[in-house]
Amino acid sequence: MSASLAGLERKLGYTFKNQDQMLLALTHRSYAGRNNERLEFLGDAILNFVAGEALFERFPQAREGQLSRLRARLVKGETLARLARGFDLGDYLRLGSGELKSGGFRRESILADALEALIGAIYLDADMDTARERILAWLADEFEGLTLVDTNKDPKTRLQEFLQSRSCELPRYEVVDIQGEPHCRTFFVECEVVLLNNKSRGQGVSRRIAEQVAAASALIALGVENGND
């Protein structure tokens, strides 16, 4: 085991029994051979479960939609990448030469994916309790600042944060029609989300309101919220 990996283990707060599992978690798909995508898939599922379980216990009065919004904030790519930078994770990644030259070790999505892969690797190397303990320790500061006030953000912000938590492209809004007299117009907007086959629609007395309605419809279509949240 190299000194560099030992240093990373100290930062993570976990020592791997199987070093190959750790190396695989740090291997981007641009690198020759096996990569961390399967571990990332597993780690993402574990992270979402652990975050959801912790929120369920922490906020017993919260509604489903509120819990979903809080979880989206906790597990979004921006948050995970910030944690990864705190571990200097980019210094340990195995990247292909092209990705390395383009600064992939600094890229938010690559850092976030690698952290999820490490979660999956810890689970396989140890057990669920150990993975849970590490996740909660890493996210302790994030949990400390959470309140239900955070769920009062507008639908566009909530949709954006949800998509970021899934490393998806941001939604695109388009005004498709404007009806009525200049002093009493109704704006019709479509919202395109990569996870949905159909565009969500909204209307309102201003473009901003119509976009908010379309975003709210998209959240419902995604199953993140329901009409009562």
UniProtKB/Swiss-Prot annotation:
Cell location: Cytoplasm
GO process terms (BP): mRNA processing; regulation of gene expression; rRNA processing; tRNA processing
All copies of domain RNase III, residue ranges: 5-127
Catalytic function, reaction form: Endonucleolytic cleavage to 5'-phosphomonoester
GO cellular component terms given for this protein: cytoplasm
Functional summary from the UniProt entry: Digests double-stranded RNA. Involved in the processing of primary rRNA transcript to yield the immediate precursors to the large and small rRNAs (23S and 16S). Processes some mRNAs, and tRNAs when they are encoded in the rRNA operon. Processes pre-crRNA and tracrRNA of type II CRISPR loci if present in the organism.
Protein name listed in UniProt: Ribonuclease 3
